């Protein structure tokens, strides 16, 4: 499986193509992505982060082997070929264990890498940029690179042991701020400088040499940088090509390397396409997909309230709010302001902290109740027009069935379509 190295080769040959990475563990988001890739006959890159999935279960309760099994089972049920499915691990390193001494955190990171590689993940993002309990802040490029090289060695050995060949593709480096959207309000963002990008590359090259890993350099396909894109709770910082032009030109000097851009969620279609042209040829998207899922569910809940007596309504919105108030750990340190501001953020924020709550059994039951209520009889077209106008057009043209599930899937696919178009190339 060489989809990524082939994509990079074509991009370097001037095709201005790219691939997007779906960063979500939600079954409906993954179904939407698999069906979209299937319809367009493209490979699909799905990534799990070190927060979501790790050897202890992460916040999803899944190990890498569990996640792979879950995705592959879904792909099989939708007749999507497994050889077109690429699984990636994002921010793999001591991220989850920053409160531990470095030696202990890195021992856990070794096991994290082993568990991802043994499970068949082929795209590995090595990120050791975070300081552990007894580390200086910030870490030097050399320490970050030495730790990444250590993990690369573990990855290569694990891959050979389990699969008899070393065919992993690596991403190095990190963006600022933290993964998953900024915590604070933003107005402008510093773009990674060419010098900083070069320093990261050279430090990693030197560290890999010291580990005897020279041969894997062509499989280091991407460097994560900050092109100047980010979102907070209510704002998006749009890509400004002029600010990233020096960075964009710098990567042209590396024949097997492109950039990976994180937090591209909510960028305009024009910005996504320009990012690809400027060699940010792996576009990560996650919160924007669960945001679209949430939009569709809120719309269906509003339709339900119009159609169904209150006493038999699912009450999805209220159940969600009650659970988030009862278990505030996923949003409390992110959302600030008075009670009303925090209420709005819980429901509507771009950072979409609500995505952590969909697996909750009470919320899942309310979701199932909502779908049952709306599946009993056809949803009136005027209500689809009112609450899901983009889907209404497709329902009227006959290309979309007006069932709750299909309306949700299609609304998510509207976002995927923007990424697909940006990545198509010339």
Swiss-Prot record:
Q: Tell me the GO BP annotations in alphabetical order.
A: carbohydrate metabolic process; D-tagatose 6-phosphate catabolic process; phosphoenolpyruvate-dependent sugar phosphotransferase system
A single GO cellular-component term from the record reads: plasma membrane
Q: Which InterPro entries match?
A: Aldolase_TIM (IPR013785), GatZ/KbaZ-like (IPR012062), GatZ_KbaZ_carbometab (IPR050303), TagBP_ald_KbaZ (IPR023435)
Annotated SUPFAM superfamilies: Aldolase
List the pathway annotation: Carbohydrate metabolism; D-tagatose 6-phosphate degradation; D-glyceraldehyde 3-phosphate and glycerone phosphate from D-tagatose 6-phosphate: step 2/2
Quaternary form?
Answer: Forms a complex with KbaY.
Q: Which PANTHER family match?
A: D-TAGATOSE-1,6-BISPHOSPHATE ALDOLASE SUBUNIT KBAZ, N-ACETYLGALACTOSAMINE PERMEASE II COMPONENT-RELATED
Function noted in UniProt: Component of the tagatose-1,6-bisphosphate aldolase KbaYZ that is required for full activity and stability of the Y subunit. Could have a chaperone-like function for the proper and stable folding of KbaY. When expressed alone, KbaZ does not show any aldolase activity.
The family annotation for this protein states:
Belongs to the GatZ/KbaZ family. KbaZ subfamily.
Under which name does UniProt file this protein?
D-tagatose-1,6-bisphosphate aldolase subunit KbaZ
Query: Gene encoding it?
Result: kbaZ
